[in-house]
A protein has these predicted regions:
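A contiguous catalytic/ligand-binding core that recognizes phosphate-bearing ligands
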Residues: 7, 20, 43
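Short, small-residue-biased leader/transition segments that mark boundaries at the very start
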Residues: 2-8
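Conserved alpha/beta-hydrolase
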Residues: 33-59
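A short, charged/proline- and glycine-enriched loop
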Residues: 9-11, 45-46
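Short beta-strand element of the alpha/beta-hydrolase
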Residues: 10-18
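The serine-hydrolase catalytic nucleophile loop
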Residues: 19-31
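Glycine-rich, phosphate-binding/catalytic loops in enzymes
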Residues: 29-33, 67-68
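Flexible "cap/lid" subdomain of the alpha/beta-hydrolase fold that forms the substrate-access gate
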Residues: 57, 63-92, 98-99, 103-177
Length: 177
């Protein structure tokens, strides 16, 4: 947690990383967000930056049970409101952080007043779909199947990948790059 300068209106901002990232990807932007005047920015808004590790990732411990983005959003909302005392905040997320940020905005809109995501989740609001939406779904599924081998292997055979990734930094790089 890094608090903003007292000179400006402070806005709490939770930055949520993805995979294979960690909070390290935010290190270069935290200071400019907290102290914009040091970087020539004269805006009246700056941020209190909170950059937690997703449970089970990087610098965080392993959860007792498997949890998904919606549960993590609940945990992060409690972090922001109950633990840190913010009534309102905004969220930014990429990759898995996008999914978590989306749930923050959806389930916790009383507190999470805005989200910025850089990976758009494909969701449909409940209710009947138009013909255009049905056609989009059909094309999306075709594209998804042909372009998502990465996701399919990670979600169905992660143990297979783990052998290469644990054995060699080159194995990790080959998969990620």
């Amino acid at each position: 947690r890094r608090q903003a300068s007292d000179v400006y209106k402070r806005q709490p901002l939770i930055l949520i990383h993805g995979w294979p990232g960690s909070i390290v990807e935010f290190l270069d932007i935290i200071e400019p967000l907290c102290e914009p005047e040091k970087f020539g920015n004269k805006d009246e808004i700056c941020f209190d930056v909170i950059a937690p590790s997703i449970p089970g990732f990087a610098f965080s411990g392993k959860p007792a049970n498997p949890i998904g983005p919606r549960k993590i959003a609940e945990i992060f909302n409690k972090l922001m409101t109950e633990n840190l005392g913010y009534e309102r905040y905004v969220a930014q997320g990429g990759d898995w952080g996008s999914a978590i940020s989306t749930w923050l905005g959806f389930d916790h809109s009383k507190n999470c007043k805005g989200i910025h995501i850089n990976m758009l989740p494909a969701r449909h609001i409940d209710g009947p779909k138009t013909e255009e939406e049905k056609n989009w779904d059909k094309q999306f599924n075709i594209d998804y199947i042909s372009q998502s081998g990465y996701f399919a292997i990670q979600s169905t055979k992660p143990q297979t990948l783990s052998y290469a990734m644990m054995e060699s930094p080159v194995g990790v790089a080959a998969w990620i790059v």
